[in-house]
């Protein structure tokens, strides 16, 4: 085992070096550096995407990279080469260009991602809330279809007692591995044990153990949230924002280890890869740093990338607005599996295949209770409503602080046009009020769970104030 770990360490070092070369040179085809095998997936077309539902050999790798805003990825046009692995998957797959999460803190966002329901309908809004057992989650659908289901996570907000382990044969935090001596965490608040090296090691063991089975594997990377980087990947500078970019490059290299393992095991040509995030990160664009405080675009614009068991001859870009609630309706539809229970999200497969026009007037919502970590305080709700090019942020406590942006003209949301567009504000306010009046899908709403002192310390170690 020691020799195997040393061999893995050498491979990891060379992969980091190779991806670093790719990042600095602007080369997305990182297979050509890092002593990697050529991409032996066959070439595919839209017709092959439509035919995925007919395959009986397909695996699904579902990757959540925590705290990852899409505009910091070179795959999404960022000027720095932060994400050569994701670049390659995007260039040979499909990228959803205007994609948003449903909240700016993990548990509420992940509840919406897994169920396809908006936060108002999951009722997972506060730190003691949990997804109820009656909910139907994707892992249960895969399990029923005969897949081996595995989940490997490092964020305490997706722990089993919050309802996220439903349907998983294996649902675990990874065992600790030795980290490089040059590794460091620059997180301003909070520090959790381990690194994504641990996750990669455990994921590799899962892939090797189940390479002859059909599997569904969920990986939740955390090193971007923790601002972890190494000497080799600390190439973009030393400000807090620079360190965030460095940590994306580091995490991208670790994700690259998983991709390389798929090739080594002969699984790349029969694996669908889905990459998303739970929320982004702020760097003072609207006065705040971090996340879980507001709903501006820097904390809600997130990636959604699909990589297929074949290389698309031409990369696909879906420019319509999509959301995390659409992810699982899309993936399950693509695979021909049963859908979620009454989701708010919708399958985007037809849109992906070019069979329907761009739905410019689709409504989208994100929600945050600013007092989510303080049970003794009343709810302090923010609701973002997106309709066409307009994005309305409604402060339920104080509507005088409502904001309106034209995200086509002002994607950074720097110019509040509320006073200039009274009719649109009224229309969007009515949409917000209708949305907030919705009932949870499940009778009684979310469950409330007790959090013991050890788990509370672990959650506070993420950097949050919880009372």
Regions flagged by a language model, labelled:
Residues 2-467:
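Catalytic domains that recognize anionic headgroups
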């Amino acid at each position: 085992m020691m020799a195997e770990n040393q061999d893995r360490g050498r491979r990891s070092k060379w992969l980091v070096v190779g991806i670093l070369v790719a990042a600095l040179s602007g080369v997305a085809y990182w297979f050509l550096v890092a002593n990697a095998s050529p991409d032996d997936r066959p070439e595919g077309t839209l017709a092959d995407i439509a035919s995925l539902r007919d395959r009986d050999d397909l695996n699904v790798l579902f990757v959540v990279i925590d705290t990852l805003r899409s505009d910091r990825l070179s795959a999404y046009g960022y000027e720095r080469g932060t994400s050569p692995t994701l670049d390659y998957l995007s260039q040979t797959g499909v990228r959803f260009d205007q994609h948003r999460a449903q909240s700016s803190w993990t548990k509420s966002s992940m509840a919406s991602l897994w169920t396809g329901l908006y936060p108002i309908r999951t009722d997972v809004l506060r730190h003691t809330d949990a997804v109820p057992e009656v909910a139907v989650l994707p892992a249960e659908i895969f399990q029923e279809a005969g897949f081996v289901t595995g989940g490997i996570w490092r964020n305490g907000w997706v722990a089993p007692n919050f309802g996220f382990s439903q349907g998983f044969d294996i649902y675990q935090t990874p065992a600790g591995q030795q980290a490089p001596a040059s590794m460091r965490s620059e997180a301003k608040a909070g520090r959790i044990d381990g690194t994504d090296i641990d996750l990669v090691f455990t994921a590799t063991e899962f892939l090797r153990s189940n390479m002859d089975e059909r599997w569904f594997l969920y990986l939740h990377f955390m090193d971007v949230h923790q601002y972890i980087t190494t000497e080799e990947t600390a190439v973009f500078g030393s400000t807090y924002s620079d360190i965030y970019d460095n940590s994306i490059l580091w995490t991208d290299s670790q994700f690259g280890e998983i991709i390389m393992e798929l090739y080594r095991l002969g699984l790349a040509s029969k694996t669908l890869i889905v990459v998303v995030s739970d929320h982004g990160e702020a760097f003072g664009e609207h006065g705040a740093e971090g996340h879980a405080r507001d709903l501006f675009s820097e904390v809600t614009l997130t990636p959604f990338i699909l990589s297929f068991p074949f290389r698309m001859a031409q990369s696909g870009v879906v420019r319509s607005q999509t959301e995390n609630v659409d992810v699982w309706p899309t993936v399950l539809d693509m695979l021909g599996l049963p859908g979620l229970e009454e989701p708010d999200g919708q399958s985007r497969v037809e849109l992906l295949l070019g069979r329907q026009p761009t739905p410019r007037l689709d409504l989208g919502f994100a929600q945050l209770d600013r007092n989510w970590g303080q049970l003794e305080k009343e709810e302090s709700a923010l609701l973002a409503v997106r309709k066409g090019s307009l994005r309305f942020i409604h402060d339920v406590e104080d509507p005088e602080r409502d904001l309106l942006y034209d995200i086509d003209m002002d994607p950074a949301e720097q110019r509040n046009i509320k006073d200039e567009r009274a009719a649109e504000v009224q229309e969007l306010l009515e949409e917000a009020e209708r949305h907030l009046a919705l009932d949870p899908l499940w009778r009684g709403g979310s469950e409330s769970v007790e959090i013991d002192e050890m788990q509370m310390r672990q959650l506070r170690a993420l950097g949050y104030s919880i009372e």
